[in-house]
Design a protein with these regions (language model features):
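Membrane-interface helix caps and helix-loop-helix hairpins in membrane proteins
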Residues: 67, 95-96, 118-131, 138
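C-terminal transmembrane-bundle signature of multipass membrane proteins
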Residues: 143-146, 167-234
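Helix-loop junctions on the outward
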Residues: 51-74, 115-121
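Internal transmembrane alpha-helix with an interfacial aromatic "cap," most often the third helix
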Residues: 23-27, 59, 74-114, 118
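Hydrophobic alpha-helical transmembrane segments of multi-pass membrane proteins
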Residues: 18, 40-58, 175-185
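Membrane-interfacial loop-to-transmembrane alpha-helix junctions, especially the N-terminal start
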Residues: 35-44, 98-103, 165-168
């Protein structure tokens, strides 16, 4: 039974419900999108749907054991974080030609970031593993701010795609900065499981749902523009 005074447990519950609501919203709103944007909204719904399932399990682990649901959390991230980079690829592919190499660079970097974090949180060289995870994240930031992904976005010529891309890159830079803070507060003998889980939970709440909202905004905006253009030329 969830104790109303258990801050960590309450955050697990709130975020479970929020992820379910977001999944329903993105699924329903998919009908308003056209073309490749439908796929983008489907992936956004997959991200929050997968997260909702894992958050219900993580809440149960926390309530029953009082311990951090480490494995469930990283399984969730290993599924949802690569999907978020699929979103980056789909945004670019919606308006221009994108190389498969860009997709794999982002995918491999995101998986490396997570694997280093998991190994560190399991207690094996937590500080070096944490630093390696941060370096993988920094590479991702380089790619989306100054690398191939950034250049492809600048040349796309699609206003909705460019707006979404610019918003998402700031989520990955500012929003994702919360995760290393939680990691370094939680590892080591003085680490706090409560602080780590509250920080991770709030970060997931902001980053997963905000990611999807950005996609939804771009999808509905671009779809409305295309519909208006079609009516004007009819």
């Amino acid at each position: 039974m969830l104790d109303p005074n258990d801050l960590v447990g309450v955050t697990f519950w709130i975020i479970s419900a929020a992820m379910v609501a977001a999944t329903y919203f993105f699924t329903v709103e998919r009908d308003r999108a056209v073309g490749k944007w439908k796929t983008s909204l489907t992936v956004a719904a997959m991200v929050t749907g997968i997260a909702a399932i894992h958050y219900f399990y993580m809440r149960g682990v926390w309530i029953e054991t009082g311990q951090s649901p480490l494995v469930f959390r990283y399984v969730d991230w290993l599924l949802t974080v690569p999907l978020q980079f699929v979103e980056f690829y789909l945004i670019l592919a919606a308006s221009t030609v994108v190389s498969a190499g860009l997709f794999w660079k982002l995918m491999i970097a995101s998986i490396a970031m997570l694997m280093f974090g998991f190994i560190g949180e399991m207690g094996y060289m937590p500080l070096p593993m944490g630093i390696l995870g941060v370096l993988a994240w920094v590479y991702i930031l380089y790619e989306i701010f100054a690398g191939e992904a950034s250049k492809v976005n600048a040349a796309s010529g699609n206003a909705a795609s460019q707006t979404a891309y610019n918003a998402l890159k700031w989520i990955v830079s500012v929003g994702w900065a919360i995760y290393p803070i939680g990691y370094f507060l939680g590892v080591g003998e003085s680490g706090s499981a409560e602080a780590l889980n509250v920080i991770y939970n709030l970060a997931d709440f902001v980053n997963k749902i905000a990611f999807g909202v950005v996609i939804w905004s771009a999808a509905t905006s671009d779809s409305a523009t295309q519909a208006s253009s079609s009516q004007a030329t009819a």
